[in-house]
């Protein structure tokens, strides 16, 4: 049986071999066809767009704020000529989800200092009402030293803010907006109130706003001049008629804000740019600036420059170019520069060597241990007593502390007292490290960010100008030694 099985196996093997030979030409022709098909020349994919490497030089047609200097009529007739309230009804009718998604795509980050993504923040508001109304609160309590951008919007382009309130309110499902204006801003309030009356008379606000079927009210509240009310929860407390002291979080305002209702607090500039973004498209807005730092921005430059100004420019513009293009350069030339505070008094200063190349956006300034903040650029030339300047800021934060948190209430006082002694060199070298330690005990240990704002300028001074502090201490010690010997 074994030979028979062997013969049968051999026959089976021969038949399989013959069958394979019969199929091989067909397989070869199929593989050849496939190969010829696969090797057919395909058009090359389009090259990726070149990565943008230079920022700045914003064209006039790309500016959102076209009446920043008050050269034109700030009220309704002039505003409509400049494009405000153009087909606002169509934007409203596109709905809440569309507005929020477009804002997310634009890459807009909050212009009040924190830089939180605006579309994401708006989306935190409840999607389904539990019976409580939702509110938009606009933080116009612009009190940061060096910051003067929002007042230009309220004074010269108030309808941009009012239209933005409606658009943002629809995006948040809010029934009303409260604009909280700094107490000292009298002219700004008068212009904004007149613009509000015009908008109501024209049917742009109130019942059936812009004929869209959406009811939206706008209220204007005058503050009393307290810096702490620029903190969002302190602002809500003040709006409710209480002392302006920050609240503990959670609950966050999006869950329990004004009068215990869902609330979003946002900056004047953030709200004012939203209608233009929706009209021109998020892709247009995100084409400016670096990734994650999109759009245009209002920069207010003051201090030792030839022409202080507030100007709208592209995000990520080099700091040096911003000053030389729009302010006529540093007083006495760039080589006369000592240091710059790039984002209002709450951020650490940066010395001249960093200012040479740094870009004006959130990420670039964070990388050099500073921040964009409100984009209030304070320029100090070599005539500045930098220690005295930071000591003066320390006094400001001591004066404006609400006193609720012990680290801030006590720490800001100690910062100011030590800085006053450092100013005249009346200290010991080891006290510089003690001063640094005091800032660390304040930073991150308070309910709101005022403690951080008080600590960071002092930390920046120690980081970049420690030799100056040491020089003053040594020189005073030498003088006292000589006086004692005499």
UniProtKB/Swiss-Prot annotation:
It is a peripheral membrane protein. Keywords: 4Fe-4S, Electron transport, Flavoprotein, FMN, Iron, Iron-sulfur, Membrane, Metal-binding, Mitochondrion, Mitochondrion inner membrane, NAD, Oxidoreductase, Respiratory chain, Transit peptide, Translocase, Transport, Ubiquinone. FMN binds at residues 222-270. GO terms for molecular function: 4 iron, 4 sulfur cluster binding; FMN binding; metal ion binding; NAD binding; NADH dehydrogenase (ubiquinone) activity. Its cofactor is FMN; [4Fe-4S] cluster. InterPro entries: ComplexI_51kDa_subunit, NADH-UbQ_OxRdtase_51kDa_CS, NADH-UbQ_OxRdtase_suF, Nuo51_FMN-bd, Nuo51_FMN-bd_sf, Nuop51_4Fe4S-bd, Nuop51_4Fe4S-bd_sf, SLBB_dom. It is an enzyme of class 7 (translocase). Binds 1 FMN. Binds 1 [4Fe-4S] cluster. Residues 1-30 form a transit peptide. Its EC number is 7.1.1.2. GO terms for cellular component: mitochondrial inner membrane; mitochondrion; plasma membrane. Residues 31-57 are annotated as: Disordered. Transmembrane segments: none annotated. [4Fe-4S] cluster binds at residues 402, 405, 408, 448. NADH binds at residues 110-119. It holds the Pfam family Complex1_51K. The keyword Transport applies. Residues 41-50 have a biased composition (Pro residues). It catalyses: a ubiquinone + NADH + 5 H(+)(in) = a ubiquinol + NAD(+) + 4 H(+)(out). Residues 31-40 have a biased composition (Low complexity). It is found in: Mitochondrion inner membrane. Core subunit of the mitochondrial membrane respiratory chain NADH dehydrogenase (Complex I) that is believed to belong to the minimal assembly required for catalysis. Complex I functions in the transfer of electrons from NADH to the respiratory chain. The immediate electron acceptor for the enzyme is believed to be ubiquinone. NCBIfam families: nuoF_fam, PRK13596.1. Belongs to the complex I 51 kDa subunit family. Complex I is composed of at least 49 different subunits. This is a component of the flavoprotein-sulfur (FP) fragment of the enzyme. This is NADH dehydrogenase [ubiquinone] flavoprotein 1, mitochondrial. It comes from Arabidopsis thaliana.
